[in-house]
Amino acid sequence: LQGPDWYGGVGARIAARCDGAPWLAVLHSGAGGFAPAITDVAADLVGLLFVDAVLPYPGRAWTQTAPSALAAHLRRVTKDERLPPWNTWFASDPTPALIPDAAARAAFVGELPRAPLAYLDAVSPAGTAWARLPAAYLRLSPAYEDEAAEAQHRGWPVRRLETHHLAMVSEPDMVAAALSELAASLGSE
């Protein structure tokens, strides 16, 4: 029995909103895993910018790539078959330290989804078209150094900022400047 196509559905919705002119996908955190699904359906996608993100895991589920302790923890804290908002996955909410501005933090937290638990076990499309697109990596936090090193190994432009995972909210100008620089290195602005 196969459940909903989480990856294909997200890819189709993004492509429907963005196609019509050349565009770059900016993929943050777990959204990096959606690159194959987006690439499979987006006609005008010209490149990928990964921002403190996991790299694609085509043909595998998130649970096959994530630390087993994290996957087990998320299963324990799931209610009504939905994951809790990201900021509650931890012993204490990290957002006050990462987003000091109360209004910006409230806006961010207010938009955090409660994703279906089934998404964790959904298999990402096995396509490889994403690997043929120009790509770059922006590392914001040390937690994503392994991914940045892998991106560098692939020959992608990599930029490392010494900040934190949610810097696009608390330091948007700095992150935007780094993204613009990386986009230019791919030949897109």
Language-model segment annotations:
Residues 1-21:
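Active-site catalytic motif of lipid deacylating hydrolases and related acyltransferases
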Residues 7, 113-178, 186:
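Conserved serine/cysteine hydrolase catalytic core
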Residues 9-16, 37, 94, 107, ...:
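Alpha-helical elements of Rossmann-like donor-binding domains used by nucleotide-donor carbohydrate transfer enzymes
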Residues 17-22, 42, 182-189:
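Glycine-rich phosphate-binding loop signature in dinucleotide/nucleotide-binding domains
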Residues 25-26, 48, 137:
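Conserved alpha/beta-hydrolase fold motif
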Residues 26-35:
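Gly/Ala-rich beta-loop-alpha elbow adjacent to hydrolase catalytic centers
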Residues 40-88, 119-120, 124, 148, ...:
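Flexible "cap/lid" loop of the alpha/beta hydrolase fold
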Residues 83-129:
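Conserved alpha/beta-hydrolase catalytic His-Asp/Glu region
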